[in-house]
Amino acid sequence: MRVVILGSGVVGVASAYYLARAGHEVTVIDREAGPALDTSFANAGQISPGYAAPWAAPGVPLKAVKWMFEKHAPLAIRLDGTRFQLQWMWQMLRNCTPERYAVNKGRMVRLAEYSRDCLQALRADTGIEYEGRTGGTLQLFRSQQQLDGAAKDIAVLREANVPFELLSPAELKNAEPALAAVSHKLTGGLRLPGDETGDCQLFTTRLAALAESLGVKFRYNTPIDALAIAGGKIAGVQCGSETVRADAYVVALGSYSTNFVSKLMKIPVYPLKGYSITAPIVNEAAAPVSTVLDETYKIAITRFDQRIRVGGMAEIVGFDKKLRAARRETLEMCVNDLFPGGGDTSKATFWTGLRPMTPDGTPIVGRTPVSNLFMNTGHGTLGWTMSCGSGQLLADLISGKKPAIQADDLSVHRYLNEVAGQTRPAYA
């Protein structure tokens, strides 16, 4: 089968790889000059299935009000003048109940755990290298309230059989030796030893090369204008003056997916703006060895070979990609507070990207009401974590195979109501 994939981020490239491995003739189209040059370029570097959780959580609405008055708040909201933004935020609020949080987190962990299994198999099969580490993830708590609040996450981890360790301040150094110097600032930590880290952009670039070796064609610097529709099906992709035709089409355009398919259906994927800095390591003993999550500031600090990546925060501001100095200040403050002297933040590069987020946190993967159109988008902050599993799942669906995990609650249909032949957003 001929398959066209729109988007060459980590999700699109993973989809291409698994589809090609299944025997399909795959073409990837992207406006950028190469793979992973947008949202996948400088993310936090985490592969964290156990920390797969929706931003829509109990207590978040009240926290959001509090964060409005804090200098280093992890969340900021600025109205972008669109009705869609207001609808999306309302849908997100509807998912902040304990019941919805448990459902959403459960299916996110399911996909993320499966994706890690797919990544491990990929690594065993191909030997792909991307500055990867398997030292786990350590979530740090700065207050007793945060530590107590982790109980609901631990319950979900137990139910999903995800290994974890609850560490006292004195035990944190066993996972991250450099934290011994700052343990007095912390009340404890939750460690997931099965999590991994690495450079997502490097991973995506090398996976694209592997996909090319399987026959995948990458068409970069190519405009993606619209979907051509005929007889209730997709007849092609309009790319400038050319129409590219296939048997099946996959939309993996991240935050841009919503506008691209708006004439066919309304999907609630909104850009959640995040930031990162990448600093050279100057003192190995003072640097992290894997990934640390600061629960207070919602910031991840990740070790690469000779670099430290610090990323996080969320701004609901539309498609604004302006770099804001105050956000860099927060990232530098966080890493220097926990790992003083480990990296030279004065020499750090500064980046921002738009994560494609759904109101319930779960990505949209699978079939759509249009028979030959498939979606693989809306992974939020977990694009790399879920990429391999999403790609394999999509390849199975397109190939007519039963996926290895439950997939019906991942499709766009959880958000669509059929009304007189039209589709409109519904609550997940």
Curated annotation (Swiss-Prot):
GO cellular component: cytoplasm; plasma membrane
Database matches in Pfam families: DAO (PF01266)
Positions contributing to FAD binding: 3-17
UniProt keyword annotations, A-Z: FAD, Flavoprotein, Oxidoreductase
Pathway assignment: Amino-acid degradation; D-alanine degradation; NH(3) and pyruvate from D-alanine: step 1/1
Listed EC numbers: 1.4.99.-
Alphabetized SUPFAM superfamilies for the sequence: FAD-linked reductases, C-terminal domain (SSF54373), FAD/NAD(P)-binding domain (SSF51905)
Cofactor(s) needed: FAD
Reaction(s) catalysed by this chain's protein: a D-alpha-amino acid + A + H2O = a 2-oxocarboxylate + AH2 + NH4(+)
Molecular function (Gene Ontology), one example: D-amino-acid dehydrogenase activity
NCBIfam families, per the entry: PRK00711.1
Family as reported in the entry's similarity comment: Belongs to the DadA oxidoreductase family.
Protein's UniProt name: D-amino acid dehydrogenase
Organism: Burkholderia vietnamiensis (strain G4 / LMG 22486)
